Swiss-Prot record:
InterPro entries: AASS, NAD(P)-bd_dom_sf, Sacchrp_dh-like_C, Sacchrp_dh_NADP-bd. GO terms for molecular function: lysine 6-dehydrogenase activity. Keywords: NAD, Oxidoreductase. The keyword NAD applies. Optimum temperature is 70.0 degrees Celsius. PANTHER family: ALPHA-AMINOADIPIC SEMIALDEHYDE SYNTHASE, MITOCHONDRIAL (PTHR11133:SF22), SACCHAROPINE DEHYDROGENASE (PTHR11133). Catalyzes the oxidative deamination of L-lysine in the presence of NAD. Can also use (S)-(2-aminoethyl)-L-cysteine as a substrate, but more slowly. Can use both NAD and NADP but the preferred substrate is NAD. Homohexamer. Belongs to the saccharopine dehydrogenase family. Its EC number is 1.4.1.18. This is Lysine 6-dehydrogenase. It catalyses: L-lysine + NAD(+) = L-1-piperideine-6-carboxylate + NH4(+) + NADH + 2 H(+).
Amino acid sequence: MKVLVLGAGLMGKEAARDLVQSQDVEAVTLADVDLAKAEQTVRQLHSKKLAAVRVDAGDPQQLAAAMKGHDVVVNALFYQFNETVAKTAIETGVHSVDLGGHIGHITDRVLELHERAQAAGVTIIPDLGVAPGMINILSGYGASQLDEVESILLYVGGIPVRPEPPLEYNHVFSLEGLLDHYTDPALIIRNGQKQEVPSLSEVEPIYFDRFGPLEAFHTSGGTSTLSRSFPNLKRLEYKTIRYRGHAEKCKLLVDLTLTRHDVEVEINGCRVKPRDVLLSVLKPLLDLKGKDDVVLLRVIVGGRKDGKETVLEYETVTFNDRENKVTAMARTTAYTISAVAQLIGRGVITKRGVYPPEQIVPGDVYMDEMKKRGVLISEKRTVHS
């Protein structure tokens, strides 16, 4: 198969690294508006399969020209490009996967292209990161093994191995996105009813092998498409994992309106957004700076099988790759989108149209693919008679 990777940033680079190592991948084209950046990645990865091109993703004609001759597109661009990329892929007759974008309902707009994609014989899968992404695939896999699905509980965190004050956290993805997840309300299902709860609320203790006690709390966006894929759930909740005390400190910032987009103040005659100041202060403070990080993930799917109450639990503790200087979050995210792109290219995934991950990605095959890449996902089944 021939794969086009859009975006030579961290995720695009790591997806390309994974793709060129696959025997099934004949050629990889890495496209970016900054050609020098793409060419630098090509030099770093030392693969004859890999080539760089300049593409402005805001120009559908350039996008279409770049897509031609490829089997699958791995879209590792900022989420605002996702709808344009999906539409262009459908028009060009090329399969496409992306990292998602629930801010501004971008993923919803991609999902609305289902009939067009189906008619074109194209598969589009959005939301293929960790959360959403890995958690959706594992939720769908757990649900497929039950006769009735009653609850899905999700816990995910990307944290430093050795925390440092003031927040005991280092950012492993966009800080802007993090503030949005902490500020916007979280959608949950409780007692069969959809409702919103404040982010950073309902803090609970949580433990993982080698890590704990930690804390978990509600944040926005994590339940993604699961409430629609499983509308009859009695309970659906997503919580972010951090070191203890983090939620309380961040809640103060939110309560002071320092994280909101719509707040401005006047200082010495200048209009200033406190959020912009906060981001400028936090970015150098919270930079990972090459320190070790870890992704902790737990998915708990409950329901009934053969009349018995059954709980399926999936868990991973994944560390960074020191040799290649790749964060744990980048590994788990890039491996997920690359592995699923290859499942489409190999003909393992054959459904055509636009589907969220939980409805189309075979969980057992996905777990095997991640194991090959050093990301081990354990599975535990508990049956209550």
